[in-house]
Regions:
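Cysteine-centered catalytic environments shared across enzyme families
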Residues: 2-271
Length: 271
């Protein structure tokens, strides 16, 4: 999506609670208020004995029913996400008959994939994202960030060693005594208790690609496919031009597909 990341959703999470969660709920809501500019359309909160998730939403896909945090049908999983899952329609088709989706949100696919694949879901989804998922029944959580870190994410600990996660640094300031950025292409599972790289490709190393020749047609096809899938939106979108070559090329490609909605596989006209 061509939306500026600073105008996307935001969330604050608290895990490993060692105090009464009711007392901490007010604190987390105050922290979330510091990033409310990221999500003016909806504010939602989950408050449990061992975890709290607060979400500020900017509606792009499924504005009517995609409010967060998202819950699984049985209410045992709760999810807060900032980002977009571009291949959610394909995943929904694959899970037809296996999972009863509650909303049209692109991010809801994370819930059944977690049940089915655990951290393996990260290789299944295509998009830009930062999310925190809490398994209420087992008191376990999973936090993850997209491959190159398009979506911001930070973590921290307070004096009682309670664990926080937030979309912006300022949500953690004044509460956490230790703060650090959450690395791109990594996840943090409560089972492992540390940051683990999940996105690792051989082309990270120059030696693996130094003999690879240029393939202009393949590059063009990949660029057009990337732009097209990121036009997914249930609200009108616009483009800001910086005057550089990259924004001009992306705008030209977007114009090529702008007349039809990618959500309906080009069957319906766009706005």
């Amino acid at each position: 999506m061509t939306t500026n990341e600073q105008k996307m959703c935001g969330f604050v999470g608290l895990f490993d609670i060692r105090q009464k969660s009711d007392a901490l709920r007010t604190q987390v809501l105050k922290m979330s208020k510091n990033i409310r500019h990221r999500g003016p359309d909806w504010s939602g909160v989950y408050c449990g004995e061992r975890a709290i998730l607060s979400h500020e939403r900017l509606s792009i896909v499924d504005p009517q029913s995609g409010g967060q945090p998202l819950f699984s049908r049985d209410g045992k999983l709760v999810l807060a996400v900032n980002g977009e899952i571009y291949n959610h329609r394909e995943i929904r088709d694959e899970l037809a008959g296996e999972y009863d989706f509650r909303t049209g949100s692109d991010c809801e696919v994370i819930l059944p994939l977690y049940r089915k694949m655990g951290v393996g879901l990260l290789e299944k989804i295509s998009g830009i994202f930062a999310f925190a998922l809490y398994d209420i029944e087992n008191d376990e959580y999973l936090i993850a960030r997209d491959p190159i870190g398009v979506i911001p994410l930070y973590i921290g600990w307070d004096r009682d060693e309670q664990f926080y996660v937030a979309s912006e640094l300022k949500a953690l300031e004044g509460v956490c005594t230790t703060i650090q950025p959450f690395l791109p292409g990594h996840y943090w599972s409560s089972k492992e208790g540390k940051m683990v790289r999940w996105y690792d490709r051989d082309w990270f190393e120059y030696d693996a690609v130094k003999e690879t020749g240029a393939d202009i047609p393949a590059l063009r096809a990949a660029l057009e496919a990337a732009v097209k899938r990121q036009l997914m939106s249930d609200v009108p979108y616009g483009v800001l031009l910086s005057g550089g070559l990259d924004s001009s090329i992306i705008s030209a490609v977007a114009r090529k597909f702008a007349d039809r909605r990618v959500e309906s596989h080009d069957r319906d006209r766009a706005w």
